[in-house]
Each structure stands twice: as C-alpha cells, then as structure tokens.
C-alpha cells in the first residue's frame, strides 16, 4: 500500500497536494500527488512500497493545514458486482489490517457524492459484520486500534485502507457534526466551536475553556465568536466599531469597546483567550497576533487568515513562519497549529498556545 488519500475542501486540492508533497519530502518520503479539480480529495502516491504507512505513522496529522482526514490505501477496486460488493473489499483488506477498532465507509464532501453517502450508511452494517468475521475488525469498537476506511469515489468503485487512531481525525469524513445554535448572532460561531473541537483535546476543555476566564474578541460584531466564549461563562471584551447583538449584552458578561481591533491594547494582565475573525490581509493579521503573543497579552489565541486567490499554501506558510520567528526571537515557547476547517471558506484557522513558565517571575508570565 503506497498511496495516501487526503480528504480536503473541494477547490483546495492543489493546496492540499502542495502541502503533502512539501511535508512528505521534508521527511524524505518521496512521491507525486494525483489531483482532480473539485474532487474533494488528493492521492499522494509514494515511490517506495511501504512509504504510505510510514507517512501516516510519522508525519503528525495535526501539522497538516488543508487535509481533513487521511488514510493509506491500495489499488482502486473497480466494477464491484452489485450482487456481492462485500467479498472483494474483505479480500483486499485481509492481511493488511488485523482487528481494526472502527469502520468508516466514506465519500468526498461534494454534491455529486451525496447520493453515494446514503448507500455508504446502509452498506456499513453488513460490511462491518463481514469484516469482523474475517478478523479485519475486532468484535467491538475501540479507539486503540487502527481505523478501517472504505472510500467510494463512484458507485461500485472504492479505495480500501486504514489510518492510525492516534494520528488521524476522530471525525467521520474529517468533519465534526455541529448544530447551529438558534440564539447565536451569526453562523460564524460554528468556526470557533469547530476550532475548539479540532485544536483542544476534549479532556482539557474544563481547564483551558474554564468558567470565569477573561477573553478578548477582536472584530467581534455582531458577536458570533463572542457567543462561544459567553456560552462557556467567560468574561469578554468585544472590540469592534460595529454594534454587538443585544442578546449578548443582556448576559452581563460582555463589555463592548467601540475601537479598532488593530489599535486596541488590553489593560488587564490575566487574559486567557484572544480570538479574531477580521477581514484583512493575512500578513497584517499575523503581525497583530505576533504582537499579542510576544507581549504576553493572552495565553492562547484562535484567529482566521483570509486566503489570496493564488499561492494559498505559500501565503499561509509564510505567515505562520513569521509568527514562529517572532516568538523565537523573544525566547517564547509556543505550539502553533493551523487547519482549514469545515466551516471555513477562503480562509484557514490558526491556534497558538504559549507554553507558560513553571517558575514565577519569568518575563513570559507578565
């Protein structure tokens, strides 16, 4: 199995391909990407037979920006007989995976695949039973074993393979299923909620998204992102010349500051979170975020970088490298992650967490 399938947002296949080619090459795993425009997936074909497994084992999935999910696969199965689609799939997976922990029968996130998705859901139950009988799947679901993927690209036409549960997306098709809260002021609220799911482990939410924290929302109007912070019982400074939703102001947790987000400077020294979703050039936003982090004005930040029409991967990489360089220059240790979320459009969402000193009095504990 020398191919890796990467699911992505339709229209961003070139960026996904450029990224995996770059990051696989850095680890001396060489190959080439097969790209079909608006297909919603990319296939990276490695030159060496075992390099597909090596890639999904060694390259951290969290380091990828444009991939929603990935898994290693073998050759394409075509012309599956309608009377028995199961046997060829079982035969393909036997000897490749033993006692997998979960089965996901998936498609790309395109309009053309929606009809196929209905079939996948029905097909999952009998296929799971057959894979358990064959020993490909364990008799019970477990997150400690590899995930078995069956990826349909057309009726009767699929790739089969696996991913490692400690280095993949935990979500079906790489998409968290979130429901829009009726009381939220705008649909952008789902971007921040998804970012929390993607960037912050579930067992750390109570500590890192805690009641009573102080937060700042730059470019807050009408309050889609502020809503997520208020929902978690934080106190929020919402910075924007535009008005905030009255429902948020009525909570008593929001202080509306009619200022330009680029000029605002916090007066508190205990701000845990700064979030920012402003329509501005990515370099300008990156510079502002670096300033907040270098000065210790917040512990963690989630922000969006709007993408240009061309060279999107290069632009994002350049801005992330700039932030990293600023942090390095000032001796600040931090974790940086970026992802094009399901609820993002022409943008990527970035999370930066300062690793604060254990010893009091350090300059990064101001």
From Swiss-Prot:
**InterPro entries, A to Z:** RlmM_FDX, RlmM_THUMP-like, RNA_MeTrfase_FtsJ_dom, rRNA_MeTrfase_M, SAM-dependent_MTases_sf
Name its cellular compartments: Cytoplasm
Q: Name the Gene Ontology biological process terms.
A: methylation; rRNA processing
Tell me which SUPFAM superfamilies the record gives.
S-adenosyl-L-methionine-dependent methyltransferases
Q: What Gene Ontology cellular-component terms does the record carry?
A: cytoplasm
Q: Organism source for this protein?
A: Shigella sonnei (strain Ss046)
> What's the Enzyme Commission number for this chain?
2.1.1.186
Q: Name one GO molecular function term.
A: S-adenosylmethionine-dependent methyltransferase activity
- Show the Gene3D superfamilies listed in the entry: 3.30.2300.20, 3.30.70.2810, Vaccinia Virus protein VP39
List the protein's name.
Answer: Ribosomal RNA large subunit methyltransferase M
- Keyword S-adenosyl-L-methionine in the entry? The reply is yes
Name the UniProt key words of this record, in alphabetical order.
Cytoplasm, Methyltransferase, rRNA processing, S-adenosyl-L-methionine, Transferase
The record's note on quaternary structure and interaction partners says: Monomer.
Similarity comment: family membership: Belongs to the class I-like SAM-binding methyltransferase superfamily. RNA methyltransferase RlmE family. RlmM subfamily.
């Amino acid at each position: 199995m020398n191919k890796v399938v990467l699911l992505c947002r339709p229209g961003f296949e070139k960026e996904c391909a450029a990224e995996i080619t770059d990051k696989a090459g850095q680890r001396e795993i060489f190959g080439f990407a097969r790209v079909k425009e608006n297909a919603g997936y990319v296939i990276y074909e490695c030159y060496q037979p075992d390099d597909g497994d090596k890639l999904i084992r060694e390259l951290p999935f969290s380091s990828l920006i444009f991939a929603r999910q990935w898994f290693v696969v073998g050759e394409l199965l075509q012309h599956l007989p309608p009377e028995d689609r199961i046997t060829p799939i079982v035969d393909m997976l036997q000897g490749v995976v033993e006692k997998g922990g979960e089965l996901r029968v998936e498609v790309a996130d395109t309009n053309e695949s929606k009809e196929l998705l209905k079939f996948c859901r029905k097909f999952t139950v009998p296929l799971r039973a057959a894979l358990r009988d064959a020993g490909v799947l364990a008799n019970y679901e477990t997150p400690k074993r590899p995930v078995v993927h069956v990826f349909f690209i057309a009726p009767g036409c699929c790739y089969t393979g696996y991913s490692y549960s400690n280095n993949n997306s935990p979500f079906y098709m790489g998409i968290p299923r979130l429901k829009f809260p009726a009381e939220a002021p705008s649909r952008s609220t789902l971007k921040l909620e998804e970012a929390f799911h993607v960037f912050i482990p579930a067992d750390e939410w109570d500590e890192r998204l805690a009641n009573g924290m102080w937060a700042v929302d730059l470019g807050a109007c009408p309050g889609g992102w502020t809503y997520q912070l208020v929902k978690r019982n934080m106190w929020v400074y919402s910075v924007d010349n535009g008005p905030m939703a009255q429902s948020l102001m009525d909570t008593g947790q929001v202080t509306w500051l009619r200022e330009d987000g680029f000029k605002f400077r916090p007066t508190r020294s205990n701000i845990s979170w700064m979030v920012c979703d402003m329509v501005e050039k990515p370099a300008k936003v990156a510079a502002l975020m670096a300033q907040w982090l270098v000065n210790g004005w917040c512990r963690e930040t989630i922000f969006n970088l709007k993408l240009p029409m061309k060279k999107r991967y290069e632009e994002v990489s350049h801005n992330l490298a700039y932030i990293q360089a600023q942090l390095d220059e000032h001796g600040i240790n931090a974790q940086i992650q970026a992802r094009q979320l399901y609820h993002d459009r022409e943008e990527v969402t970035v999370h930066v967490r300062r690793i604060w000193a254990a010893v009091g009095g350090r300059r990064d504990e101001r």
